[in-house]
Amino acid sequence: MAHLPRVCPFIRRLRVALLCLRPGHRFAHSEPQRQRPASALEMAVGIVVIFSAFLTPSAYVLSNLSQFRRE
């Protein structure tokens, strides 16, 4: 991070992003590509899980907002 002030003007001029110190290393996939597409049921379950994970805590906070304001 000490070299960042010297490198930043150089990066802006060339429009290059410095992502890591060791170039050439890339992420390898941990498992092979899926052979069949996801079914409608699998997608529906995934969407329900994602939305409930975000909406349940926010619904709790909004329903008890008056208690949070008092504290």
UniProtKB/Swiss-Prot annotation:
User: Could you tell me which pathway this protein works in?
Assistant: Energy metabolism; oxidative phosphorylation
Q: Where is the transit peptide?
A: 1-28
* Top-level taxon: Eukaryota
Task: Please state where this protein is localized.
Answer: Mitochondrion inner membrane
Topology versus the membrane, per the UniProt entry?
Answer: Single-pass membrane protein
**Membrane-traversing stretches:** 40-63
Q: Give the Pfam families listed for this entry.
A: COX8
Indicate where this protein is primarily found. mitochondrion
Ordered alphabetically, the record's keywords are: Membrane, Mitochondrion, Mitochondrion inner membrane, Transit peptide, Transmembrane, Transmembrane helix
Q: What GO terms describe the biological role, i.e. biological process, of this protein?
A: mitochondrial electron transport, cytochrome c to oxygen
- InterPro entries associated with the record: Cyt_c_oxidase_su8, Cyt_c_oxidase_su8_sf
* SUPFAM superfamilies, per database record: Mitochondrial cytochrome c oxidase subunit VIIIb (aka IX)
Provide the membrane-side ranges marked Mitochondrial intermembrane in the record.
64-71
Topological domain (Mitochondrial matrix) residues are 29-39
Q: Which GO terms describe its cellular component?
A: mitochondrial inner membrane; respiratory chain complex IV
Keyword Nucleotide-binding carried by entry: no
Its function, per the record, reads: Component of the cytochrome c oxidase, the last enzyme in the mitochondrial electron transport chain which drives oxidative phosphorylation. The respiratory chain contains 3 multisubunit complexes succinate dehydrogenase (complex II, CII), ubiquinol-cytochrome c oxidoreductase (cytochrome b-c1 complex, complex III, CIII) and cytochrome c oxidase (complex IV, CIV), that cooperate to transfer electrons derived from NADH and succinate to molecular oxygen, creating an electrochemical gradient over the inner membrane that drives transmembrane transport and the ATP synthase.
Question: Quaternary arrangement and interactors, per the entry?
Answer: Component of the cytochrome c oxidase (complex IV, CIV), a multisubunit enzyme composed of 14 subunits. The complex is composed of a catalytic core of 3 subunits MT-CO1, MT-CO2 and MT-CO3, encoded in the mitochondrial DNA, and 11 supernumerary subunits COX4I, COX5A, COX5B, COX6A, COX6B, COX6C, COX7A, COX7B, COX7C, COX8 and NDUFA4, which are encoded in the nuclear genome.
Family the entry assigns? Belongs to the cytochrome c oxidase VIII family.
The protein's name in its UniProt record: Cytochrome c oxidase subunit 8C, mitochondrial
Q: Which organism is it from?
A: Eulemur fulvus fulvus
**Source taxonomy:** Eukaryota, Metazoa, Chordata, Craniata, Vertebrata
Annotated gene:
COX8C
